[in-house]
Structure formats: C-alpha cells, structure tokens
C-alpha cells in the first residue's frame, strides 16, 4: 500500500445482468482491516468461497494488505478473475508497483511455433473479451490472434493487456498458434511485457 497518497477505489470489468463469462472486480483501498472480499452473483453460493480464496491470494501477490474487494461475478473463469483483480489494483495504485498475479501456466502453452506451419486461417479475438477466448480453439484455426489494437477502447487497453497475459498462460489453445497484435509503435512497446514470455508465439505489428 502506498503511503502519503490519496487512496482511490477502482474497478475493472463489465457490469450488468447480461454479463457472461466475465466479472467486475472493484478494489476499495483501506488503511486497516486486512482484505475483505464480497462476492455477488447468481453462483455466489456455489463458488463464493473459491472466489474469495483467489481474491485473497491475488491481493497478497499484488501487495495489497488492506482493502475491500467486491466481485460481481457473471460466471468468470479463474484467469478472468485474476486479470480483473490485477487491473483494478493497478488502477487504484494500492499495491506493489508492477506486481503481477500469475496463475500457473499450462504445460502446453510453452515453446516456439513449428517452422513451416500453415497460417491459412486466423481467428481474431478482442483482447478485452474473455467470453470469446475460452472456446476459441474449438473453431480449429491455424492461429488465434489476441488483439490489443482496434478491438480495444483506449480506456480499456490497460485491462486488456492483463487479460491477454492471463489467457495466454491459462487457456487450452489446442493446435492454434498463439499470436498477439500489439498497438502501433511506440505505444505498442507497453504491450510486449504482457505477451512475451507468457506463451505468445508471434507478435503482430499493425500497419504503419
């Protein structure tokens, strides 16, 4: 927790009854009281304890000692919850600067692309839409492109970077090549740490 600075609540993720496979995580920094988690949603009675445990673990990893964390869950998978929490903490500036909440990486999400592999079909997936990510491999594309450029609003690029990193590490991409399209340079440089070293096999640079 940063001292000598006004603490501001922040959130990441969509709200509303129509939200599916996503969540809104709100972080309200406090000066004492440790981390208190509240889970709301239709499946809170089933998964509330697991979500609470994940949020508590995430706050510890991110350096958040005292905060109220409110999760409005719409059926989000663990990688989505991790991404929304980290993005909210970064926005609130209440944890350890540049800390990451990294879930274990799937064993298959390692290694470079095979030389000479076909790239006939590529599926673009918006970097801020986890509801499209989990089943992307079912379409059996040669490559999946997690897009951080055109499909992401400027105000949501910070959260999308974290989401893409968490998805690269956690999801089963089948035989698809894992690609990330970054923003135009020099701004796209900020995208690279969230893709390189986390399972991306190819970085796509927009036309300049």
Regions found by a protein language model. Give the residues of each.
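Conserved alpha/beta-domain cores
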Residues: 115-117, 122-140, 145-208
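N-terminal intrinsically disordered, cationic/polar leader segments
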Residues: 1-113
């Amino acid at each position: 927790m940063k001292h000598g600075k006004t603490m501001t609540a922040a959130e990441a993720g969509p709200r509303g009854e129509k939200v599916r496979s996503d969540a809104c995580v709100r972080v309200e920094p406090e000066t004492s009281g440790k981390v208190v988690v509240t889970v709301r949603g239709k499946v809170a009675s089933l998964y509330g304890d697991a979500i609470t445990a994940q949020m508590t673990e995430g706050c510890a990893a991110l350096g958040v000692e005292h905060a109220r964390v409110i999760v409005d869950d719409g059926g989000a998978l663990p990688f989505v919850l991790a991404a929304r929490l980290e993005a909210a903490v970064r926005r609130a500036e209440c944890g350890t600067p540049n800390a990451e909440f990294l879930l274990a990486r799937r064993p298959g999400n390692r290694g470079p692309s095979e030389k000479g592999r076909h790239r006939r079909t590529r599926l673009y997936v918006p970097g801020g839409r986890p509801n499209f990510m989990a089943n992307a491999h079912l379409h059996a594309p040669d490559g999946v492109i997690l897009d951080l450029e055109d499909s992401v609003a400027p105000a949501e690029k910070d959260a999308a970077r974290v989401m893409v990193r968490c998805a690269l590490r956690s999801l089963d991409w089948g035989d698809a090549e894992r690609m990330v399209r970054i923003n135009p340079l020099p701004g796209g440089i900020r995208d690279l740490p969230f893709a390189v070293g986390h399972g991306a096999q190819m970085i796509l640079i927009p036309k300049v």
